[in-house]
Amino acid sequence: MATIQEIECDFLAKIAQKFTNAEIELINKAFYHAKTWHENQKRLSGEPFFIHPLRTALSLVEWNMDPITICAGLLHDIIEDTDQTEANIAMIFSKEIAELVTKVTKITNESKKQRHLKNKKENLNLKSFVNIAINSQQEINVMVLKLADRLDNIASIEFLPIEKQKVIAKETLELYAKIAGRIGMYPVKTKLADLSFKVLDLKNYDNTLSKINKQKVFYDNEWDNFKQQLKKILAQNQIEYQLESRIKGIYSTYKKLTVHEQNISKIHDLFAIRLITKSELDCYHILGLIHLNFLIDSKYFKDYIASPKQNLYQSIHTTVRLKGLNVEIQIRTQQMDNVSKFGLASHWIYKEQKEGLLAPALQLNYLVTKQKHSHDFLKRIFGTDIIKINVSASHEPNVIKQINVDSNNKLLDIAFENYPKQFAKLTKIEIDGVEINSFDTSVENEMLIEFYFGKNNNLKSKWIRYMNNPIYREKVKKSLAKLAKSGRYSELAFYEKELGEKQLKLASETEIQKRLNTLRIKKMSDYLALIECTNFTNDEHLLFLAKNNDKWNKLTKPLKFAFSKVVFHNSYFEQIEGIFITKIVIEPCCSKIPDMPEQVTGILTKNILSVHRYGCKNLQNKKQLKIIPLYWNIQQLKLKPRKFRSYININGVWSEKTINKICQTIINGDGYIEKIIPKINKQKDEFDLNITLFVNNYQQLLTLMDQITTKNISFSWKYL
């Protein structure tokens, strides 16, 4: 590690390159005051304490933060660790710097308080303290400053007791790494996650690092050859660019390995190349050359230029398939690259003006300009709301845990997270003292949730559908697979037991399949999936499986209509009486959105209802098929709002910023762009744009098109 003298030289040299004389004078003032106030303090490593705020401030300089935030970085431990007060800092520097230092101190103190809770293992929910500490109009730079502080602390954590290391590492991984990702600071997120992972699980850290290194050695020649090919193609087309290589982070790779059964070759973005070029047009030119010259895995293609992420990240991602190796290519401009590395921090560009005004990133920096309140801020950061619930379990009488969770959690997510060892034995859940009928329930604020566990394994495959957490779902799948392999789990056995309680036996597999054929159902698993979500009053679903039941065929009609009713109920269409369907498929061939003028229709084929627009080309010359008019279910659209795919063609007069304006207007209007195919004729100044986008309904689509007309763009449009 560098000495404090080396870091001081580096820091002073970098601020000299970036700032005006007046700004340098302010930063130097903070530098020397912080050094003086921390003069007699030491870290556990024996180093001068000042090395920590100095490294924190150096990170802020490298992340392009403004002088106010850099000064606060130098002073961020002053209130906590010296006798200086907020008033003193405000008097010597400014009120703005003093408030920043106070805000960061608040977060630090709340974090420490959470760590010292008596039941910290149960109660340490790391999102909650931010919700408490940032309780009034705060800005993104507070969190950026805190990220710089935490990055240095986690990088030098080895001098703390092991248990304290683990608590801080857990906090860093679950909160700070996530915040860094949400505001677009991906390199910082990777560093925080990897350093935390090393503390929390050194064995898996080393194992994952070893696998990555083996891949690097094994594919070294293939990797180098590909880069040379790429450089040659770009040189032949006279494209200016910078090429950067990266290997996926250790923790991120570990998480992917858990999904891909420890097979590292299945990770498509382990190796990546960044191509940084001058303009958006060059980005798409490079994309075309790559797709023309290499084999592409299309399922990983993402156009974040046309449809930026909420944290402003923009780039085109495409994956090249080489011999035994996948390489992700990221194509972006220099400005996009700055955002990808520093996220919203990249927008604290300090203008060289006499008055020294900060220049936040115009309308783009909506997290600062629009989301001032901490509740909204956290909702943006975590992509969901944070709610408080109370949980208890039958095996822990008189123990109630108060925890904070994302609002998109379901009951089984909570059960698995808090009681993983007992999860498979879950038999009953009560909410506020009342037993619920279905485990497929989301959590709500202030709920009291009581979990009841039995002695025997009660795990069911349908529970997977009742969970939102993909990691937990994957673990349940693996548990079911193990049980099935050992012969200790079978859903048929569950229904056989229910029949036994009625003094009936299960029919043979051959007989059951014969009966399923009458329902046009091929697999027993499909039948079980259907009856799981169907309410029967007279046990028709069980009697249908019973041995020596001559009346089973009389049950087919009520079963068919019951199944059809459930399928329609779970769709966005009104029920059509008198038909039997097992599935509704909204086909991707044409635009079908609520409220559109054209009739939506369904083609019934082998009990599957395929949904098309009346004018769809796939319906032409198919009069022999059974075509059924469909009607949107207004109530379902209100209860379960979602976006629907629409294909739009836009053509008109082209200019350099036309396509970008169109895409930005759609995004700002809450449309989601999935794919964009532009054709530009510069000689005629014309463009033709095919866009696949998702909207709520036809009215939203019309509104988006109207908004585009306000951007001084001459165009016409139609849906396909």
From Swiss-Prot:
GO biological process, one term: guanosine tetraphosphate biosynthetic process
Cofactor: Mn(2+)
Source organism, top-level taxon: Bacteria
Keyword set, alphabetical order: Hydrolase, Manganese
InterPro entries named among the record's database cross-references: HD/PDEase_dom, HD_domain, NT_sf, RelA/Spo_fam, RelA_SpoT
Enzyme nomenclature, EC number: 3.1.7.2
MF term (GO), any: guanosine-3',5'-bis(diphosphate) 3'-diphosphatase activity
Catalytic activity: guanosine 3',5'-bis(diphosphate) + H2O = GDP + diphosphate + H(+)
HD domain residues: 49-154
Pathway connected to this protein: Purine metabolism; ppGpp biosynthesis; ppGpp from GDP: step 1/1
Similarity-based family: Belongs to the RelA/SpoT family.
Purpose of the protein: In eubacteria ppGpp (guanosine 3'-diphosphate 5'-diphosphate) is a mediator of the stringent response that coordinates a variety of cellular activities in response to changes in nutritional abundance. This enzyme catalyzes the degradation of ppGpp into GDP. It may also be capable of catalyzing the synthesis of ppGpp.
Protein's name according to its UniProt entry: Probable guanosine-3',5'-bis(diphosphate) 3'-pyrophosphohydrolase
Species in which this protein is naturally found: Mycoplasma genitalium (strain ATCC 33530 / DSM 19775 / NCTC 10195 / G37) (Mycoplasmoides genitalium)
Gene that produces this protein: spoT
